[in-house]
A protein has these predicted regions:
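N-terminal Rossmann-fold NAD(P) dinucleotide-binding loop
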Residues: 229-230
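Residues that form generic nucleotide/phosphate-binding pockets
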Residues: 9-16, 26, 81, 125, ...
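Glycine-rich Rossmann-fold phosphate-binding loop(s) that bind the pyrophosphate
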Residues: 224-225
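Glycine/serine-rich phosphate-binding loop and adjoining beta1-alpha1 elements at the start
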Residues: 70, 89-216
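Short, Gly/Pro- and small/polar-rich lid/capping loops
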Residues: 1-35
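Conserved hydrophobic helix-helix packing surfaces used for dimerization/oligomerization
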Residues: 218-220
């Protein structure tokens, strides 16, 4: 269980933090998880979809975290991923809380125009609950989503909130032609590249793991070839 595993490792780390048990429990606890179910008329019938948006911590706002489209996603997975977003941001002092979203869907089973209708309906459900908002909750691409879906979501937000001058900031990962940033697509994989580079430049860390700094003699295992793995490789 992904959520139990996440909490187990965090609990293990918190033992060394000196925090009180009640504060440690509050840090681990997810603030809220919203389940939304909505219908979309497609192919002559109404299909019902289920999705989630979890907010782990609002100690900093907006909260930040991707939206994935995946048949295997579920509420507990989304909660675990939201928690990891909180921890990642806190560890490196990025001023965001943690959030995550998921829609139980196989994107490959739908044509682009159908996927757009589904994405926009999901966005509407989240927007009206302030679960997509430039100042409160900002999604990004994840498994099964890309800059295309982010552009649809941003457009839907601007339709619902036309007076919000920061409307385009309701999601990150948009195409550069839709107010997105050049280089964002490869940014995460590039970040891993820099981490590995700096690791091998640090003699103290290399000594701890009994490695030398000659990268030409090293091999590695890459788990997955999604956005991060592709650009890293």
């Amino acid at each position: 269980n992904f959520l139990l595993d996440t909490n187990k490792y965090v609990n293990k780390a918190l033992k060394y933090s000196g925090l009180s048990d009640d504060l440690a429990n509050k840090i681990i606890t997810c603030n809220s998880t919203y389940t939304v179910r909505f219908g979309v008329r497609l192919r002559g019938q109404i299909y019902t979809f289920e999705g989630w948006r979890s907010v782990h911590s609002e100690h900093m706002e907006p909260t930040k975290g991707g939206i994935r489209f995946d048949m295997d996603t579920h509420a507990e997975e989304v909660e675990a991923l939201a928690a990891l977003m909180s921890y990642k941001c806190a560890i490196i002092n990025v001023p965001y809380g943690g959030s995550k979203g998921g829609l139980k869907i196989d994107p490959s089973q739908w044509e682009s125009r159908e996927l757009e209708k589904i994405t926009r309906r999901f966005a509407q459900e989240l927007i009206k609950r302030d679960l997509i908002s430039p100042s409160m909750n900002v999604p990004a691409p994840d498994i099964g989503t890309s800059s295309k879906e982010m552009a649809w979501i941003a457009d839907e937000y601007r339709k619902i909130h036309p007076a919000d001058i920061n409307g385009s900031a309701c999601v990150t990962g948009k195409p550069p032609s839709k107010n997105g940033l050049v280089g964002r697509e490869e940014a995460t994989g590039r970040g891993v590249q820099y981490i590995v580079r700096e690791f091998f430049r640090n003699p103290d860390l290399l000594k701890l793991v009994k490695l030398d700094n000659d990268l030409s003699t090293k091999s590695f295992i890459l788990q997955g070839l999604g956005n991060v793995g592709y650009h890293l490789s």
